[in-house]
Amino acid sequence: RQVCPTGLDKIDSQDILRGGLGRGELGVVAANTGVGKSHFLVAMGCAAMRAGKNVIHYTFELSEHETGKRYDSNLCDIPSNEIIERKKEVVDKYEKMDLGKLIIKEYPSGSASVMTIRNHIEKLTLKGFKPSLVTVDYADVMKSSRAYDSLRHELKLIYTELRNLAGDLNKQIKILQNLTL
């Protein structure tokens, strides 16, 4: 079983995930708005990169630039609001690290479906980029491949298609979901 660590030792333990999320598995992070799900997803991507895994991070809320700053902040241990002014230090730190590669792709909310993501991954694979981990921030705002009267049914279809994508591509996919309680 090939795994990708979450970066959380307790969750990655042999008792729970046996080292991390396995290929073809779908991990869902669900919590209320504003508690740090996007930061957590970045932290999981960084843990995978530190383990030498290649990561694709799809973002539907933040820009590629802001998402990249979060990765830089996490990997270099520099506050994100200081990344730009400490650019030389960031570059120096990266030169000393042995990391997997990262691709960040931004789509406007409601514009990309699971098929869009599948096509993008296949295009990257043809160019030689082989991801071990795919992250989606947020699946809730993706475009459904079918219209339903109920949002619940559309979301169920999106999550089913993401799970199938993970299995078809033999990749770990981690997604975020907003909970409104």
Predicted features by range, described:
Residues 1-78:
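The Walker A/P-loop phosphate-binding site
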Residues 13-17, 52-130, 144:
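Cytosolic-facing regulatory segments adjacent to core modules
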Residues 24, 52, 130-131, 170:
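A general structural motif
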Residues 28, 132-135, 174:
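Structural motif
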Residues 47-49, 154-181:
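Substrate-engagement module of ASCE P-loop NTPases
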Residues 107-112, 142-157, 165:
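Short, contiguous acidic/charged loop-to-helix segments that flank catalytic cores in large enzymes
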Residues 138:
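Walker B catalytic acidic pair
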